[in-house]
Amino acid sequence: MSSILSRYPEAETPVHGYFYSMVELAVVRVFVQHQIFDAIADDGTSIEELATKTGMELNLLERLSNFLVASKVLSSPKPGFIGLPSETKMFQQRRAKLFYSHIFDAFMGSAVKWPQYLQNNGLAEPQKSNRSPFGLGAGYPDKSFYDVLEMMPERAQAFNSTMAIGLGDMPITGIYDFSWVAAHSGTDPERTLIVDVGGGKGQAIKAIVEETPSIPASACVLQDLPNVIKDVPEEEGILNQVQKVGSSFFDKQPTKGALVYYIRRVLNDWPDDECVTILKNIREACASDSRLLISENLLPDEPSVSLAAADLWMMNFAGKRRNVRMFNDLASRSGFEISSIAKDKTSNSAVIEMLPVQI
């Protein structure tokens, strides 16, 4: 707790420090939303001029600014003026503004509902995607994250805009060696080599084939919901050759006996029981020599602050970051066993290879 006290020297106790932190988070969100940071000149701007430029009432702006100056988020070059310290100038950048707004709205709105959520659902992590802190915080306690986004287009737009800037994106290639897949292409030309399950608009399957061009794109299948598949760009090259199938991973796997079933950044979004449903659907479609490749962030047994926070972030949506033990549990419940884990050298990304257990 010493860090919260050092952040706010006036804090008499850690509780005071946490309170000041809550105030700061909220005031910064208001400044971001109303472009207050953008209107502050490099050499400082008077409160009166800033109120005129932004349309905020002078009294309100002064009260909010007083706290940010006291907490060193803003500077005060002279009485009645405020300026931006170098570290705060990031809030003039679109990337930082989008990210901060998203994590504040999506995380804080859900986190404040944790006590009520746990009281309603028991002291356990989310068991169903349609019973999540996010849904409760948004006013739809029986809807999943994606259901809520469909009903709240403004939230969906903010979410999509943040995802589009690629914050913390996972590497696709350079982790797992797909060359063995290419070696199989000549043994059975009719066999599907890779099925990209829940593959969105094909970024992953395209990158995999680009990395290992001896894998015929025509022997690969891109699967996602029909409304996603119809928006896959029509372009010359790899994606034009890949087979496209509209389906849900919660339904029976339509492509049987593929050499590889590849699923990236999917299980992260779902609670255990729904992950088991997804994996069982794949298991039922496997041939005896099929392999399942799961590309996800792998949680270490003793995660850092950032990784533990990311896991709790996912909990808001009924998702979950998993460690090796947790993936082993999913495998055993779904008819698979882990055969290898390939880890990225510069991140926590990994490709977990599983084999179907012969029954």
Curated annotation (Swiss-Prot):
Domain of life of the source: Eukaryota
Record Gene3D superfamilies: Vaccinia Virus protein VP39, Winged helix-like DNA-binding domain superfamily/Winged helix DNA-binding domain
EC number: 2.1.1.-
SUPFAM superfamilies per UniProt: S-adenosyl-L-methionine-dependent methyltransferases, Winged helix' DNA-binding domain
Gene Ontology MF terms: O-methyltransferase activity
Annotated S-adenosyl-L-methionine binding sites: 198-199, 224, 248-249, 264-265
Disruption phenotype: Results in the loss of production of equisetin and fusarisetin A.
Keywords from the named record: Methyltransferase, S-adenosyl-L-methionine, Transferase
UniProt function note: Methyltransferase; part of the gene cluster that mediates the biosynthesis of HIV-1 integrase inhibitor equisetin and of fusarisetin A, both trans-fused decalin-containing tetramic acids showing also antimicrobial activity. The PKS module of fsa1 together with the enoylreductase fsa3 catalyze the formation of the polyketide unit which is then conjugated to L-serine by the condensation domain of the fsa1 NRPS module. Activity of the Dieckmann cyclase domain (RED) results in release of the Dieckmann product intermediate.
Family: Belongs to the class I-like SAM-binding methyltransferase superfamily. Cation-independent O-methyltransferase family.
Record-given protein name: Methyltransferase fsa4
Biological classification of the source: Eukaryota, Fungi, Dikarya, Ascomycota, Pezizomycotina
